[in-house]
């Protein structure tokens, strides 16, 4: 049975809008029972199947289904670029192609977070008339600075022409606003954009090719029972499904092994990026200034750095942020607290003094570069943007490459869909030309040139060894060296036992420059329907205490930038239990990446939940 998916008639859409007007429930709520020595956390139905649960007997499990030519998962820069380019080509050649785009955020851009200093190359290719259309590129870079920080001093480092971190010609943007604007352009071209729809499942044809996706169900109690308002998710079928989920996509995890996409690449390595927006004293405001630093407060073996961007947005606004590589080894390290400590540096604090923090957020990012890019195409689908990971790490940019990958995917798909001799060995189209075209583009050339810079930081000199490598080999050879360095394995394998590491004493936040975690999360606008199954699931409820806490001193309580994970005393008897405050989750994916036991599995909550970023 096929039912037309519309914003006005769809029951799931009506339910989603009903959720949006509910009052926010308390941020922290226990997720464990105290009736057992090893408490059981209420887990998702993917772990406890409904067909074995008597409470689901007699519930109508029929799903509405829709047919499209192309379905896109994720309305970020890559997904929107693909949608827009498809519709541009369809208009140019007078073809009728149905493109549906689903986004888990309540509004387009509400889950988007980046620095962001934009290389406009791909954006200008997509929108040659971007100025006439009023695109929100308001702040061209006017000053570009880089420095090494010690605890008390700032050592300037010249940015020579040709080095990857040069920002001449770039724009400082609020990426969420740019994505929102792109969403408007997509809808004007005829793309069907559906915010508040969380893609939860990959669907397959009988021959194993991708058939499309299904959005998640709504109206389920946190104990897994159906509510009276239960609505089944929606199926979206397509000839080609584009996965543009962003870093560490939860759907991509489902088919990486199925299609063996990582057989010929290194493990991906990640960073966690934390960001705040501040309104500062106008006398300190330098619109167009870009500052990047490495060094303090991180040691040389912990990859990371900072940014401070002055935006020209009608008020004295600055974006400050801190990135920590998730291959760090000390389980006592807290990326959030390192960020708060960094703001007290003598070269940073004066800019923020007297100002007001107005927003906070966090998101994981890919740092593996060329060596970690998986196979990009498979029968019925393909990967674009930050999902496979096209970030140019030394350039500290990935939006431009993500956009270009989306455009190239659209062009290859359009060519195959409109071919008069369309042939496919599988029910879902296998668009292999996309990967071939990407490898011939400036994206691949750019990533190949800088491929050795990030892994060069793994040596005995750490980050400083990477800087030396950049200054010698990249400066001379421009990426033409006849070797390719390898990454050292998955980030989840890098933590040392707590007994082998020195605890880190972090200063107490002063409430003016540095802040506590929960007051920070409150500025992210994060909210989830409280009475729903936990979307942060555990494969084994005993592992957090018996392994992570006993060996690594519970690193999840520190690597999470939203206070989701806490070890609290058992209500009865001695010992601790893991409490999951799922309401706090900002969808950064750090837990799914860094958990040393790989016991945490992040799945989508009900559509519309999560952060509500405004131009982050």
UniProtKB/Swiss-Prot annotation:
GO molecular function, one term: iron-sulfur cluster binding
Intramembrane bits: 108-129, 427-446
Cofactor(s) for this UniProt protein: [4Fe-4S] cluster; FAD
Annotated ranges, domain 4Fe-4S ferredoxin-type: 576-605
Subcellular location: Mitochondrion inner membrane
Keyword Lyase: no
Class of this enzyme: oxidoreductase
N6-acetyllysine: residues carrying this PTM: 95, 131, 222, 356, 415
Name of this protein: Electron transfer flavoprotein-ubiquinone oxidoreductase, mitochondrial
Organism classification: Eukaryota, Metazoa, Chordata, Craniata, Vertebrata
Encoding gene, per UniProt annotation: Etfdh
């Amino acid at each position: 049975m096929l039912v037309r998916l519309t914003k006005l008639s769809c029951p799931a859409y009506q339910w989603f809008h009903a959720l949006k007007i509910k009052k926010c429930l308390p941020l922290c709520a226990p997720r464990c029972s105290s009736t057992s020595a090893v408490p059981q956390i209420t887990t998702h139905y993917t772990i406890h199947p409904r067909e074995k649960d008597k409470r689901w007997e007699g519930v109508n499990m029929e799903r509405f289904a829709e047919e499209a030519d192309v379905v896109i998962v994720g309305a970020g820069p890559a997904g929107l670029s693909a949608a827009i380019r498809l519709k541009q080509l369809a208009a140019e050649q007078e073809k009728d192609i149905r493109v549906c785009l689903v986004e888990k955020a309540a509004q387009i851009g509400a889950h988007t977070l980046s620095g962001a200093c934009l290389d406009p190359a791909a954006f200008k290719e997509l929108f040659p008339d971007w100025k006439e259309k009023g695109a929100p590129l308001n702040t061209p870079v006017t000053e570009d600075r880089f420095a090494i920080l010690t605890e008390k001093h700032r050592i300037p480092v010249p940015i020579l022409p040709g080095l990857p971190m040069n920002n001449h010609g770039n724009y400082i943007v609020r990426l969420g606003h740019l994505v929102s604007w792109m969403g408007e352009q997509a809808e004007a071209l005829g793309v069907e954009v559906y915010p508040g729809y969380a893609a939860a499942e990959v669907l397959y044809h009988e021959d194993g090719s991708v058939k499309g996706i299904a959005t998640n169900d709504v109206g389920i109690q946190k104990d897994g029972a159906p509510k009276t308002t239960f609505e089944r998710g929606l199926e979206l079928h397509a000839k080609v499904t584009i996965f543009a989920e962003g870093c560490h996509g939860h759907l991509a995890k489902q088919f990486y092994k199925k299609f063996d996409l990582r057989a010929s690449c290194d493990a991906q390595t990640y960073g966690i990026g934390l960001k705040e927006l501040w309104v500062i004293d106008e006398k300190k405001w330098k619109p167009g200034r870009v500052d990047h630093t490495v060094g303090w407060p991180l040691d040389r073996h912990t990859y990371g750095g900072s940014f401070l961007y002055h935006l020209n947005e009608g008020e004295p606004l600055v974006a400050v942020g801190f990135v920590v590589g998730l291959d760090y080894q000390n389980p006592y390290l807290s990326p959030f607290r390192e960020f708060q400590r960094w703001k007290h540096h003598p070269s940073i604090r004066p800019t923020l003094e007297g100002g007001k923090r107005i927003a906070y957020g966090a998101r994981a990012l890919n740092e593996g570069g060329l060596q970690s890019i998986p196979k990009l195409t498979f029968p019925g689908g393909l990967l674009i943007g930050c999902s496979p990971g096209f970030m140019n790490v030394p350039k500290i940019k990935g939006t431009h490459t993500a956009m270009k990958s989306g455009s190239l995917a659209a062009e290859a798909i359009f060519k195959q869909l409109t071919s008069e001799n369309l042939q496919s060995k599988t029910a879902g189209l296998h668009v292999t030309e996309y990967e071939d075209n990407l490898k011939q583009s400036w994206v691949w050339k750019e990533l190949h040139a800088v491929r050795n810079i990030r892994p060069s930081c793994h040596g005995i000199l750490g980050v400083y060894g990477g800087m030396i490598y950049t200054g010698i080999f990249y400066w001379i050879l421009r990426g033409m060296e006849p070797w390719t360095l390898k990454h050292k394995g998955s980030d989840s394998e890098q933590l040392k036992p707590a007994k082998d590491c020195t605890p880190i004493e972090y200063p107490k936040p002063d409430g003016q420059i540095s802040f506590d975690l929960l007051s920070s999360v409150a500025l992210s606008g994060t909210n989830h329907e409280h009475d729903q199954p936990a979307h942060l699931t555990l494969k084994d409820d005993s592992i957090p205490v018996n392994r992570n806490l006993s060996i690594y001193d519970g690193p999840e309580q520190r690597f999470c930038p939203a206070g989701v994970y806490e070890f609290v005393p058992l209500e009865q008897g001695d010992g601790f239990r893991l409490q999951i405050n799922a309401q706090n989750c900002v969808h950064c994916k750090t837990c799914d990446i860094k958990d040393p036991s790989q016991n945490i599995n992040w799945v989508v909550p009900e559509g519309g939940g999560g952060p509500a970023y405004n131009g982050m």
